[in-house]
Design a protein with these regions (language model features):
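Small-residue-enriched flexible segments
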Residues: 2-10, 35, 77, 183-354
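Gly/Ser/Thr-rich loops at beta-strand to alpha-helix junctions
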Residues: 13-15, 40-42, 83-93, 177-183, ...
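An acidic, phosphate/nucleotide-engaging active-site surface
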Residues: 119-175
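N-terminal glycine-rich anion-binding loops that anchor highly charged ligand groups
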Residues: 29-46, 69, 74
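Short, conserved secondary-structure transition motifs
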Residues: 109-127, 353-355, 412-422
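C-terminal non-catalytic interaction/assembly regions of soluble proteins
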Residues: 294-456
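Short glycine-rich or small-residue beta-strand-to-loop segments that form or flank ligand, phosphate
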Residues: 53, 76-87, 172-173, 372-378
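N-terminal amphipathic/basic leader segments beginning at the initiator methionine
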Residues: 1-28
Length: 456
């Protein structure tokens, strides 16, 4: 009898949700693994830098309750990658506390492995000095200042830490920052299934049913791996996998359609095929894993200031026609009044209805009949950001631009108060590869979780 391995991906990110009916149907197929890629760098550097999640706690707890309860009651491993959204120490602890609450409320007992992804700054400094760090495309070379200024530094772990935790008997594995497919692929590879097929399956399942048609990150998907390929399926009659949808998601967030790099290897898709089978299912084969020198992607973020912003609008055709000149004159006036002579204060305008999404790359040069104006000020302190934003906003509100007819305010504000304090602003300070000779150097520990708490 042909062997297979069933991987259930309930949702694209913990907290995004999924229909209970889809999850119930998936569980009737007796999955061998429940896994979720719980985070992403897509929401930007703030969440890594601030050590905060970008998903709602209640939503994350709801999703985890289904997953942990079903996994423990049916003796199915539950593997979570990039816990808490960014996978640094505070994110891992945040997710751990939620799981402890679920165990108490659902009267569950299980062993849980915690795999931090944080990297000591001293290790990064030494690697930089030894020439063991390289920048990714379009990223400047790493500096010692960038390392020191980063609030958290994490490395994207591969499959090996997950495998080691599972080998030591963990029922639930809670990992820090991880390569997206790793949490899906670790166990099937450990059980002897082809690494290329398992990694490709994980690449698609990382976003759950987004790869189906119509796609949704808030619905379940399953990958069934065998010795020759894997089958993709959903559990919602509204969604189906197609050859096109599965192939398209394989290219998701990738610059090369044939070679997808990861920790310790490259996924070679030159011989990959997608074939529709049954009703709404797709069979994928031909994916190959090729070993490369082991490297891990480092991510770090540092604080660069504080933000204050204002949202406003105008539909005056005279103002819209001259908006670029008006903005330049307003900036000049404010800079003169505040004696701004350094680069520590940044004043930006985002003009929705003109080029708010693409900026200078916008090919359509004709503005609409109205503009949504987002004024964004970043300064060294919150107080300075507030003051500059207030002055820019009031200056633009009453600015006497060329051919102006009205003498009242130039802007319409949807909210009162108009100015919004955005708090600390972060930027990615580290987005580099570090050579790693030991793929298993992510330390982890296993704790026994019970309804009464953690047992030593």
């Amino acid at each position: 009898m042909a062997r297979s391995f069933k991987v259930l991906s309930p949702t694209a990110i913990l907290g995004y949700g999924f229909p209970e009916e889809s999850f119930r149907k998936a569980m009737t197929e007796s999955p061998d693994l429940i896994a979720v890629d719980a985070g992403s760098s897509d929401p930007g550097p703030h969440y890594l830098g601030a050590g905060k999640p970008f998903t709602d706690r209640a939503g994350v707890k709801r999703d985890l309750r289904y997953m942990i309860t079903a996994g423990v009651q049916n003796n199915i491993p539950v593997v979570i990658g990039t816990a808490g959204g960014s996978g640094a120490a505070p994110h891992l602890e945040w997710c751990r506390e939620i799981i402890h609450e679920i165990a108490r409320e659902e009267h569950l007992s299980f062993s849980m492995a915690l795999i931090p992804a944080d990297v000591d700054k001293a290790i990064v400094h030494q690697a930089l000095d030894n020439g063991k760090i390289t920048a990714l495309d379009f990223v400047p070379p790493l500096t010692h200042d960038a390392i020191d200024e980063s609030t958290y530094i994490v490395a994207q772990m591969g499959i090996e830490p997950f495998q080691q935790a599972l080998k030591e008997g963990a029922q639930v594995v809670l990992g820090g920052r991880a390569y997206d497919p790793a949490c899906f692929a670790a166990l099937p590879i450990m059980q002897g299934f082809d690494e290329g097929l398992a990694m490709h399956c994980g690449k698609i399942l990382e976003c759950a049913a987004i790869a189906a048609t119509p796609g949704s990150g808030s619905d379940c998907a399953m990958g069934i791996i065998d010795d020759n390929g894997f089958t993709l399926k959903t559990f919602n009659p509204k969604r189906k996998f197609t050859e096109t949808s599965a192939a398209a998601h394989t290219l998701y967030e990738k610059s090369d359609p044939y070679f997808l790099p990861g920790p310790g290897g490259v996924l070679n898709l030159k011989g990959c095929t997608f074939k529709a089978v049954n009703d709404g299912e797709v069979y994928v084969s031909g994916s190959k894993h090729e070993e490369t020198p082991y490297a891990l992607k480092l991510e770090g973020a540092r604080r660069v200031g504080f933000r204050c912003l204002t949202i406003a609008g105008t539909r005056d055709p005279i103002m819209i026609a001259g908006i670029d000149k008006i903005i330049d004159e307003v900036k000049t006036s404010v800079s003169r009044n505040l004696s701004l002579d350094d680069d520590s204060i940044h004043i930006n305008f985002h003009l929705y209805g003109k080029n708010g999404v693409m900026g200078d790359h916008e090919p359509m040069q004709t503005a609409g009949h109205e503009l949504g104006i987002v004024l964004d000020v970043v300064a060294p302190t919150q107080e300075i950001a507030n003051s500059v934003c207030s002055l820019v906003r009031s200056t633009m509100l009453h600015y006497g631009y060329e051919n102006r007819i009205a003498t009242a305010g130039n802007l319409a504000f949807p909210f009162s108060p108009s100015d919004i304090q955005g708090g600390p602003v972060y930027e990615f300070s580290i987005y580099h590869l570090i050579e790693a000779n030991d793929a298993l150097r992510f330390d982890f520990h296993i704790e026994q979780v019970t309804p009464e708490g953690v047992q030593a």
